[in-house]
Swiss-Prot record:
Function statement: Glycogenin participates in the glycogen biosynthetic process along with glycogen synthase and glycogen branching enzyme. It catalyzes the formation of a short alpha (1,4)-glucosyl chain covalently attached via a glucose 1-O-tyrosyl linkage to internal tyrosine residues and these chains act as primers for the elongation reaction catalyzed by glycogen synthase.
Assigned keywords, A-Z: Cytoplasm, Glycogen biosynthesis, Glycoprotein, Manganese, Metal-binding, Nucleus, Phosphoprotein, Transferase
Amino acids binding UDP-alpha-D-glucose: 42, 44-45, 48, 110, 119, 135-137, 166-167, 193, 196-197, 248, 251
Species this protein is from: Homo sapiens
UniProt cross-references to Gene3D superfamilies, sorted A to Z: Spore Coat Polysaccharide Biosynthesis Protein SpsA, Chain A (3.90.550.10)
Protein's recorded name: Glycogenin-2
GO biological process, one term: glycogen biosynthetic process
Gene Ontology MF terms in the entry: glycogenin glucosyltransferase activity; glycosyltransferase activity; metal ion binding
PTM remark: Self-glycosylated by the transfer of glucose residues from UDP-glucose to itself, forming an alpha-1,4-glycan of around 10 residues attached to Tyr-228.
Annotated pathway: Glycan biosynthesis; glycogen biosynthesis
Length: 501
């Protein structure tokens, strides 16, 4: 298939985005919210938080009627937790080490599945009757509330092997019983691909043959970079895509973006197709318009509104407390860290955000938004009914994870530059900064990403900080072990093998 054919399909998809802001149901137009159902995602570090923020804002752009929940690991920095809480209704920390015995045991037996076991934690959100999980590297192009009409376990076929489903988007029903069965399956059988997709496919092994209604249409999990062999079908149905999935090692945040020309600069030698460049342009448009302003509002201390979302530490295998619980209730089933009591932090709504370090590195401060862009067009989070922010765990210092960046850059022009789509409704920020975050003098050091914003370029890069042996030992003694990165099982095994040789 030629690049021209892909080009036309991507253009059709962009046309869909232009017209996708209108209400799609009576409940949406009436502003109704289903409080016992939620969209769920996972962010394991500050880099993936960028994807989660874009995903959350893309969902809010299309007037979702369900709650938004993000699971995070202890590696996520204090500042990113604050910003996530401005978009998501619940920010829930998942700490496998401090979890219930059956979770801890599964992790000890299968340390290589640490990230997979973290994702499986979504089944413990039993204060919701049904959820839709979306990976942090997905982008929603239109309202997808109809996914909640599907049953467990509904997912789209994987483009590489259609008899298997892709676990980037799936419908599930939270259940502690199912969660235990999944962990038992992980301990006994592992994962044939070393990740959650292999484990879930072997657990729900009858998905391909049992119930066709649990096969989501491909438009709910369209890979942005797959070379589809049936080009007429892509041209015919590509414009109906509702969720784009950025599969592969190169994620949207690994590129650089020129806000003036709308071009994407690739950090590598490989060249992306025209249709992928168009989807990358969409991702960066949401990031520029709806995520960067959140950093700026935190930096300026402008996030003053009614108390908002829940910052919850869920680490014992039970369901996290309902975010709508009354004031004064501790976080249900939470385990406070040693020496720090689980407390309901007062917000101090009249306190300005003094002393908050800058979260971004401004290369050129003369331009923060493209010419003609109004601040009213930015989407923040809607007001919620939650009476207070509940924090049941101190915001911990993350551990750095080295990133691999090459110097070669290739400029990718978008297939069709799109005027940024502004929502018909503008939401004002409603999340107050937690008092701990405002008093933390090391927020800038804790942030594990460098955001460079200038007239001609926006980039996201992971900080690389080498720790001394003393600092590494102190981290281990404090229980802050980077199981997803430097301290991953595979890397420890490599060191042991070298030592024994």
């Amino acid at each position: 298939m030629s690049e021209t054919e892909f080009h036309h399909g991507a253009q059709a998809g962009l046309e869909l985005l232009r017209s996708s802001n209108s209400p799609t149901s009576a409940s949406q137009s009436a502003g109704m919210t289903v409080t016992d159902q939620a969209f769920v995602t996972l962010a394991t570090n500050d880099i993936y938080c960028q994807g989660a923020l874009v995903l959350g804002q893309s969902l809010r752009r299309h007037r979702l009627t369900r709650k938004l929940v993000v699971l995070i690991t202890p590696q996520v920095s204090s500042l990113l937790r604050v910003i996530l809480s401005k978009v998501f209704d619940e920010v829930i920390e998942v700490n496998l080490i401090d979890s219930a015995d059956y979770i801890h045991l599964a992790f000890l037996k299968r340390p290589e599945l640490g990230l997979t076991l973290t994702k499986l934690h979504c089944w413990t959100l039993t204060h919701y009757s049904k959820c839709v999980f979306l990976d942090a590297d997905t982008l929603v192009l239109s309202n997808v509330d109809e996914l909640f009409d599907r049953g467990e376990f509904s997912a789209a076929p994987d483009p590489g092997w259609p008899d298997c489903f892709n676990s980037g988007v799936f419908v599930f029903q939270p259940s502690l019983h199912t969660h235990k069965l999944l962990l038992q399956h992980a301990m006994e059988h592992g994962s044939f691909d070393g990740a959650d997709q292999g484990l879930l496919n072997s657990f729900f092994r009858n998905w391909s043959t049992t119930d066709i209604h649990k096969h989501l249409p491909f438009i709910y999990n369209l890979s942005s970079n797959t070379m589809y062999t049936y080009s007429p079908a892509f041209k015919q149905f590509g414009s109906s895509a509702k969720v784009v999935h950025f599969l592969g090692s190169m994620k949207p945040w690994n590129y650089k973006y020129n806000p003036q020309s709308g071009s994407v600069l690739e950090q590598g030698s490989a060249s992306s197709s025209q249709h992928q460049a168009a989807f990358l342009h969409l991702w960066w448009t949401v990031y520029q318009n709806n995520v960067l302003p959140l950093y700026k509002s935190v930096q300026a201390g402008e996030a003053r509104a009614s108390p908002g979302h829940t910052l919850c530490h869920s680490d014992v295998g039970g369901p996290c407390a309902d975010s709508a619980s009354g004031v004064g209730e501790p976080c249900e089933n939470s385990t406070p860290s040693a020496g720090v009591p689980c407390a309901n932090s007062p917000l101090g709504s009249n306190q300005p955000a003094q002393g908050l370090p800058e979260p971004t590195q401004i290369v050129d401060e003369t331009l923060s938004l493209p010419e003609g862009r109004r601040s009213e067009d930015m989407i923040a989070c809607p007001e919620t009914e939650t009476p207070a922010v509940i924090t049941c765990d101190p915001l911990s210092q993350p551990s750095p994870q080295p990133a691999d960046f090459t110097e070669t850059e290739t400029i990718l022009q978008p297939a069709n530059k799109v005027e940024s789509v502004s929502s018909e409704e503008t939401f004002e920020p409603s999340q107050e900064l937690p008092a701990e975050a405002l008093r933390d003098p090391s927020l800038q050091d804790a942030l594990e990403v460098d955001l460079a914003v200038s007239v001609s370029q926006i980039s996201i890069e992971e900080k690389v900080k080498e720790l001394s042996p003393e600092e590494e030992r102190r981290k281990w003694e404090e229980g802050r072990i980077d199981y997803m990165g430097k301290d991953a099982f595979a890397r420890i095994q490599e060191k042991l093998d070298r030592f024994l040789q």
